[in-house]
């Protein structure tokens, strides 16, 4: 008896193994979207948690997650940072694996309110699912101030995280501005004024007076930062409008042009004269007088400081964050004041000699300011064109730095020149792909002549019009990476084209994922893309010939020989 049971188990196992060995290579090995991305939610008054349990080997796109309330008001949703994923057609994208928990704060929800959640993911094997939409019913929530209070903090943190550099960069910018031709030569004079012309002060006393002067200057800048941040907070939504972003980008570009010497930005000379006379009336050498001198000095903008200061102020207005606004301008003023403190304590011997290098520092800050328009325009024009703008800026900066370095005569500068030249060559790569890769891609995508269909009725009509010929239906979408790989690498192959010469070629573009697309995918029982279906001369599909997932030209050609009806 035991021997019979053992024999039966062995036969069952053998059947399973052989079934796996001879399984159709094109047959779908992928699970439905609800199993790949198990979605759930839980609400507790104002707090709603959305969770996705992501199956191993699958991932969700961060940028494809959208939440739309109906008869409800929610706080801005802050998506957590994902991990970077890169492919040939879409570049770098942030994705989520394993598990995603997304907290949503509900400020107010009426009876019958809902939340529409849209998301999309793919499998590592190259299989992508259409966007999934779930409707989350919400319990009634009454608006109150306590629930809305954390919203501004979260929103500020979100905008802060999206900005291109941290406030600590302001300290480095301030130090760099100190070495421009408009500022550095003034430091010995300012030092003498701060000390009141007294040459025999102790080091501690001199350091204290200079520190007080810098704090007075920093106070002016900090107050300015707080005012601009408060104004930005009131108009935060407007500051994200494409037209406003384009306008700000133009302003930043003009500020950068002033750093390149095309024109001069500064306060009117009459106002500068009044502020200077007011500062000169203060008594140098006394803490109170020195503090007032510093505060007034913060209002006197030289041509070298106006553009960077304006850029930082616009940066702060974008953030709408009060802490960031005050802190950034304080660190900026502190950076400008550090060289002054060193000169006051140690004397002019620490000052580098004036020369053309100071103009080069000013020009370098022009390139730094140019990075801000690129950052703003990237939100409007998209990642692809944004990368090209970054590429152009990188080529311009490294090219300028390389040409400037050719004037140096020291041997070690040759190493720097090689590094700068290599950086310029690396930066130009996205522009090369744009200039020389687009035409080739367009050509390869026209090799197969597909007839486009949209609905189930159009598919049935096309099958009738095939008049006994075999039919291949390619389901395509712009968000499907493997679909683009099929077009570029597989459908362009001469062997594949030859094998499909007598086949009617149909293609359904389901990028929009509208009602007609959903109905077509449901009718064909398609889980995701890429999926290629084969029909015989009678219009009947051969399920065993169905292809899911990417195949290279050689594998697909073999599949056509073995499977095509």
UniProtKB/Swiss-Prot annotation:
Residues 1-19 form the signal peptide. Belongs to the thioredoxin family. DsbD subfamily. It is found in: Cell inner membrane. Keywords: Cell inner membrane, Cell membrane, Cytochrome c-type biogenesis, Disulfide bond, Electron transport, Membrane, NAD, Oxidoreductase, Redox-active center, Signal, Transmembrane, Transmembrane helix, Transport. Its EC number is 1.8.1.8. Disulfide bonds join 122-128, 182-304, 480-483. This is Thiol:disulfide interchange protein DsbD. Residues 434-565 form the Thioredoxin domain. InterPro entries: Cyt_c_assmbl_TM_dom (IPR003834), DsbD_gamma (IPR035671), DsbDN (IPR028250), DsbDN_sf (IPR036929), Thiol_diS_interchange_DbsD (IPR022910), Thioredoxin-like_fold (IPR012336), Thioredoxin-like_sf (IPR036249), Thioredoxin_CS (IPR017937). One of its GO terms (cellular component) is plasma membrane. GO terms for molecular function: electron transfer activity; protein-disulfide reductase [NAD(P)H] activity. It is an enzyme of class 1 (oxidoreductase). The chain crosses the membrane at residues 163-183, 208-228, 243-263, 296-316, 323-343, 357-377, 384-404. HAMAP family: DbsD. Required to facilitate the formation of correct disulfide bonds in some periplasmic proteins and for the assembly of the periplasmic c-type cytochromes. Acts by transferring electrons from cytoplasmic thioredoxin to the periplasm. This transfer involves a cascade of disulfide bond formation and reduction steps. It comes from Shigella flexneri serotype 5b (strain 8401). GO terms for biological process: cell redox homeostasis; cytochrome complex assembly. It is a multi-pass membrane protein. SUPFAM superfamilies: Thiol:disulfide interchange protein DsbD, N-terminal domain (DsbD-alpha), Thioredoxin-like. Pfam families: DsbD_N (PF11412), DsbD_TM (PF02683), Thioredoxin_2 (PF13098).
């Amino acid at each position: 008896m035991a021997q019979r049971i053992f024999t039966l188990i062995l036969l069952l196992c053998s059947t399973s193994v052989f079934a796996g060995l001879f399984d159709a290579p094109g047959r779908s090995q992928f699970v439905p979207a609800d199993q790949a991305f198990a979605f759930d939610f839980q609400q507790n008054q104002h707090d709603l948690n959305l969770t996705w349990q992501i199956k191993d080997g699958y991932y969700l796109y961060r940028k494809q997650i959208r939440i739309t309330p109906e008869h409800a008001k929610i706080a801005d949703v802050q998506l957590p940072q994902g991990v970077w994923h890169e492919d040939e057609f879409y570049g770098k994208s942030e994705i989520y694996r394993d598990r995603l928990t997304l907290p949503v704060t509900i400020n107010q929800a009426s009876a019958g309110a809902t939340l529409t959640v849209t998301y999309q993911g793919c499998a590592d094997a190259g299989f992508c699912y259409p966007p999934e939409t779930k409707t989350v019913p919400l319990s009634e929530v009454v608006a109150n101030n306590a629930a809305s209070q954390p919203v501004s903090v979260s929103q500020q943190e979100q905008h802060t995280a999206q900005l291109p550099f941290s406030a600590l960069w302001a300290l480095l910018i301030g130090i760099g501005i100190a070495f421009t031709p408009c500022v550095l030569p003034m430091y010995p004079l300012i030092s003498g004024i701060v000390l009141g012309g007294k040459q025999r002060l102790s080091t501690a006393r001199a350091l204290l007076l200079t520190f007080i002067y810098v704090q007075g200057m920093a106070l002016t800048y900090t107050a300015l930062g707080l005012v601009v941040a408060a104004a930005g907070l009131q108009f935060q939504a407007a500051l994200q409008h494409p037209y406003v972003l384009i306008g700000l980008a133009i302003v930043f570009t003009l500020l950068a042009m002033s750093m390149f010497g095309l024109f001069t930005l500064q306060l009117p000379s009459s106002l500068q004269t009044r502020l200077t006379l007011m500062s000169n009336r203060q008594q140098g050498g006394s803490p109170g007088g020195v503090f007032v001198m510093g505060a007034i000095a913060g209002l006197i903008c030289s041509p070298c400081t106006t553009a960077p200061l304006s850029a930082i102020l616009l940066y702060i207005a974008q953030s709408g964050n009060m802490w960031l606004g005050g802190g950034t301008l304080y660190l900026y003023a502190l950076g400008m004041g550090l060289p002054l403190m060193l000169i006051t304590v140690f004397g002019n011997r620490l000052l580098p000699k004036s020369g053309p290098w100071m103009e080069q520092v000013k020009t370098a800050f022009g390139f730094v300011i140019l990075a801000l328009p690129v950052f703003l325009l990237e939100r409007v024009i998209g990642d692809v064109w944004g990368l090209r703008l970054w590429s152009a800026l990188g080529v311009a900066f490294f090219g300028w730095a390389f040409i400037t370095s050719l004037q140096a005569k020291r041997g070690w500068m040759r190493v720097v020149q090689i590094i700068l030249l290599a950086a310029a060559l690396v930066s130009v790569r996205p522009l090369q792909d744009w200039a020389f890769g687009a035409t080739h891609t367009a050509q390869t995508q026209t090799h197969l002549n597909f007839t486009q269909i949209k609905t189930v009725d159009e598919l049935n009509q096309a099958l009738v019009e095939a008049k006994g010929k075999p039919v291949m239906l390619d389901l395509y979408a712009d968000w499907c990476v493997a679909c683009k790989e099929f077009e570029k690498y597989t459908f362009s192959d001469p062997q594949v084209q030859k094998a499909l010469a007598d086949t009617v070629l149909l293609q359904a573009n389901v990028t929009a994922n509208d009602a007609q697309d959903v109905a077509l995918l449901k009718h064909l029982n398609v889980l995701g893309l890429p999926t290629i279906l084969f029909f015989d001369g009678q219009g009947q599909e051969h399920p065993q010939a169905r292809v899911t997932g990417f195949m290279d030209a050689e594998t697909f050609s073999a599949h056509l020989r073995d499977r095509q009806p």
